[in-house]
Amino acid sequence: MYRQGTPNRVVISTVPLSGEATATAGTGPGCEGGLGGWRLFKACRHEQEDGLYAMLPPDYFPVVPSSKPLLVKVPAPGASPDRTGGAVHFECVPAPRRPLQFFRQLYDGTFVKLPHNFPDECYEDEAPLATASTSTPTWIRNPCPWET
């Protein structure tokens, strides 16, 4: 189950919340509640690894780096709902929000950044968006001084 950890962090855990702990005492892993948090974990399938992967909520990253952004290795060897063992916890943080950036390709194949408020802003020699044609705008090609 997901629960709010320290500020801006989410804890993925197999332990029920304190209010649910008394209500779900004695329920098994297959029942609603109790160890329902185990559905957020799955066992490793590699021969050399004995542990679990944690399923992260959308738009969250693990606290430690991972090659798979949605599956995170949990250091809990031998822990599963079928075996007796301690609870499994994992913390993740929200993904950083990056502003949307637009690019336009130049004649030579390189790219140039467009303003953040594109397409609301246009350059001096570019036609306004309402009357813009499908041809490439002239502001992209800046002639060198020796070419003129």
From Swiss-Prot:
InterPro entries from the UniProt entry: Herpes_IR6
Name of the featured protein: Uncharacterized 16.1 kDa protein
Organism, per UniProt? Bovine herpesvirus 1.2 (strain ST)
